[in-house]
Amino acid sequence: MGNKLHIVSLGCTKNLVDTEVMMGKLQNFELTDNQSDADVIIVNTCGFIDAAKQESINTVLNLHDARKEDSVLVMAGCLSERYKEELAKDMPEVDIFTGVGDYDKIDELLVEKKSRFSEAVYLIDGAERVVTGSTYHAYIKLSEGCNQTCSFCAIPSFKGKLNSRTLDSIAKEVESLVKKGYWDFSFVSQDSSSYLRDKNVKDGLSLLIQRVELIEGVKSARILYLYPSTTSMALLKNIAKSEIFHNYFDMPIQHINDDMLRIMKRGFGKKQTLELLEFMKSLPNSFIRTSFIVGHPGESQEMFDEMCKFASSFGFERINVFAYSDEETTPAHEMSDKIAAKVINKRASILGKIAADVMQASLKKEIGKETLLVIDKESDEHEYLLSARKILWAPDIDGEIYVNDRSGEEELNFGAIYNAEITDMVGNILTATTKNASR
């Protein structure tokens, strides 16, 4: 076998961490962007909803069509885990199948050229990763699995119950990455606010915040995927007190109608959800991102209208919109009052337009303000523009800022933090003038 590797990571940032673990085990390979040159092709798949499943299958088949004759094609991750028997039967194009339990054994699988599905979900603990996409930012996994029983979600069926990493394991990984120059961290999991609850520790995230704040060299951090019913006011106050963790609140609430929240088995009603959101909004320099699902079985037009009104009026910074996907093994799959696909798509389009307007309004409020931003790279738009983001924002998902001017003579460096003024907006991209380097 040759030593050229082409690897594709689909789905969420949690998947990306697993992909980086595989890359860490294959550092003797040379990465190539050209699949037809690769000796080994790995696709880390997503099996969350229909669109993601189809993207995963199409990606694998397209790579098979383009690969050279003696290469090895590996299908890994959530889709492989969820449909291991069906895929092994229906996709002879794939040489090796593996699921969510053997990311750290990918080198062994390539030597053996055999498929493998370990029973336990892989939980990162000390494995060396090849962090991609940034020289200063990294995602850190808190846990695997989920103890929630949301009606629409199949993730626990293939990711299992909540299994949290120890504080020591996470701290060691952060410390190791800081030594390599990383200083900005996003903490992720299926349900971040339940971190350590499987170990009978109720305030796990608060303990994590305290621990990370002790690590010299960490300048910036945020927590993604908060779950409403396991997020306490005490946790929000601890985030607000932190000098490292931003007032960044990524909390997918999925709906706002009381009856719909009960049908979805979210464990929290409208009143409790609003109490959390209003408190988040009251905090200085807060940023609230959420997700909604449209077309869940039982969603009436009145319920949908209530969600639209709330989404447009509350003052979110960002909104993700998901069309309901009817997933086998979920309680919603067995419900009788399904919504027609045409209606679901129409509702997704309506709420999607509201989400776009919400983002525009949020961005417009930035014009004229001073902020801290970090410069990522040269812009793809023009050679004289630099691509940046507010240090508060999560990478890739919250937006891009074009730096088109500077007030001083100092050279601007990638991965550095600058004081800047937001000067204008072009489409949905802000422009900024840097003033001077910050911390």
From Swiss-Prot:
Its EC number is 2.8.4.4. GO terms for molecular function: 4 iron, 4 sulfur cluster binding; aspartic acid methylthiotransferase activity; metal ion binding; protein methylthiotransferase activity. The keyword tRNA processing does not apply. [4Fe-4S] cluster 2 binds at C146, C150, C153. It catalyses: L-aspartate(89)-[ribosomal protein uS12]-hydrogen + (sulfur carrier)-SH + AH2 + 2 S-adenosyl-L-methionine = 3-methylsulfanyl-L-aspartate(89)-[ribosomal protein uS12]-hydrogen + (sulfur carrier)-H + 5'-deoxyadenosine + L-methionine + A + S-adenosyl-L-homocysteine + 2 H(+). Residues 3-115 form the MTTase N-terminal domain. Its cofactor is [4Fe-4S] cluster. Residues 132-361 form the Radical SAM core domain. This is Ribosomal protein uS12 methylthiotransferase RimO. It comes from Sulfurimonas denitrificans (strain ATCC 33889 / DSM 1251) (Thiomicrospira denitrificans (strain ATCC 33889 / DSM 1251)). The lineage of its organism: Bacteria, Pseudomonadati, Campylobacterota, Epsilonproteobacteria, Campylobacterales.
